Amino acid sequence: MSTLKKPNLSDPKLRAKLSKGMGHNYYGEPAWPNDLLYIFPVVILGTIACVVGLAVLDPAFLGDKANPFATPLEILPEWYLYPVFQILRVVPNKLLGIALQTLIPLGLILIPFIENVNKFSNPFRRPVAMAFFLFGTALTIYLGIGACLPIDKSLTLGLF
């Protein structure tokens, strides 16, 4: 069964619509040029209008205004470097901190050799890779949250 609707070209109403350039969405005309040239720009401009409207109506501020005469107590890196910053901050020896960070790519490189499974198999049936992924995700979130706290509360996240 075809998913396209076949046009009845003997219908005079359809012929009148087609002569005016109407009716192309009813019988399965390809997306080019009608949808790509007319519908997509309308959706793109509508999305841009929504984003600009929301930005004008409710601007999001990045934080406190910069004051060059007041240095914060602890200078934090960008948010995506929080876990790395936490490792370097907590480990007493900086060389050990760098060595711990080199273990991350080495561990990722070793996963295919540890778990020899067909690459087309279901990823949820790969227990070693799933365990690495879940442990790494939990550790990254834990280290990222800990980096935002003072050093004495960073390992316990202030819970204990």
UniProtKB/Swiss-Prot annotation:
InterPro entries: Cyt_b/b6_C, Cyt_b/b6_C_sf, Cyt_b6/f_cplx_suIV, Cytochrome_b_C_euk/bac. Coiled coil: none annotated. The chain crosses the membrane at residues 36-56, 95-115, 131-151. It is a multi-pass membrane protein. Pfam families: Cytochrom_B_C (PF00032). Component of the cytochrome b6-f complex, which mediates electron transfer between photosystem II (PSII) and photosystem I (PSI), cyclic electron flow around PSI, and state transitions. The 4 large subunits of the cytochrome b6-f complex are cytochrome b6, subunit IV (17 kDa polypeptide, PetD), cytochrome f and the Rieske protein, while the 4 small subunits are PetG, PetL, PetM and PetN. The complex functions as a dimer. This is Cytochrome b6-f complex subunit 4. It comes from Prochlorococcus marinus (strain SARG / CCMP1375 / SS120).
